[in-house]
Every structure is written in C-alpha cells, then in structure tokens.
C-alpha cells in the first residue's frame, strides 16, 4: 500500500496438457482427455462437450510468471493481480484439435460420462478470460489448441518417458 514492497500476483489459467498421472482435482480431465489418449489409454470426460474454459500450456505459464517477475513496476501497471493469457476453448474444440493432430483413433479413446460433482464445480468457473495487461507485457495465449497439443507432444518426445507418454500416438 505504501510502496515499500513490490508484490505481484498473476492469475493462472488451467494448464493443459499437464504431464504425469491423473489426479483428483476437478480440472484434471482438461489434461486427461488429451494426455491419456496420446498414451494409448481411454479417458472419460465428466462434463458436456460445450463446456468452455480458458486454458494454456505449461510453457506459456512459465514464460508468463518469469515476465511478471522481471518486468518493471511501470510495465506491470497496477497493484492488483493480472490474468496470464489463456485460450478460451470448449471441450469439443479440444477434442477436435486432438483428432486433427493425432487422428480419429486417438480421439475415439475419449468418452463422455457426466459426473455431477465435477460438472457442478466446473459450471461455476470462468467460461473465458481476457488478459489486456499481460498482453501489454508481450504475453499472448496460444493461437489454437492444436498448438498446445503439439507443444505437449514435443515436450514428451524430448523427455525420458516418451515411449510411455506417447505410445498411442503415431506421428
């Protein structure tokens, strides 16, 4: 308040596709509907295909946090949190991207089975976001969800577990 501390806060969008095993978080399916099919595993989506939510890649999130940390107070432009950029997509758009990038066999590994608890939680989340202040810092969301999937695949291919993580994907 008095300017003695230069504190900053950034709101993160849902990071998709997150590596690793599925977890109990309500948002876990956003990664699971991409990660598991690419690994040759089935995935159950607990919400309807028309659910919309802002997502981003792990790399864009890390870049955003570094930029917020390193920018000047003037460039940061305020004392309140800023939204890091996110791509506003529906679950259906995510699955369409999966099919374009990895093919219909991979996409077919995703089925829908509504989970009322998760659907109820997700229904109260933002359907989209804007990031005007982050854009002024040179941060922008990925242009398409295809880009996010391709980045996840590239990250997996460079990692030690590529064979396991991508066993259901043929380039």
Model regions: which residues?
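Residue-level signal for the nucleotide or nucleotide-sugar donor/cofactor binding architecture
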Residues: 24-28, 53-59, 89, 129, ...
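Short, surface-exposed alpha-helical segments at coil->helix boundaries
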Residues: 31, 92-95, 128
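Mid/C-terminal beta-alpha module of Rossmann-like enzyme folds, strongest
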Residues: 37, 46, 62-119, 159-167
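Amphipathic alpha-helical segments that line or abut small-molecule/effector binding pockets
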Residues: 59-70, 146, 150-153
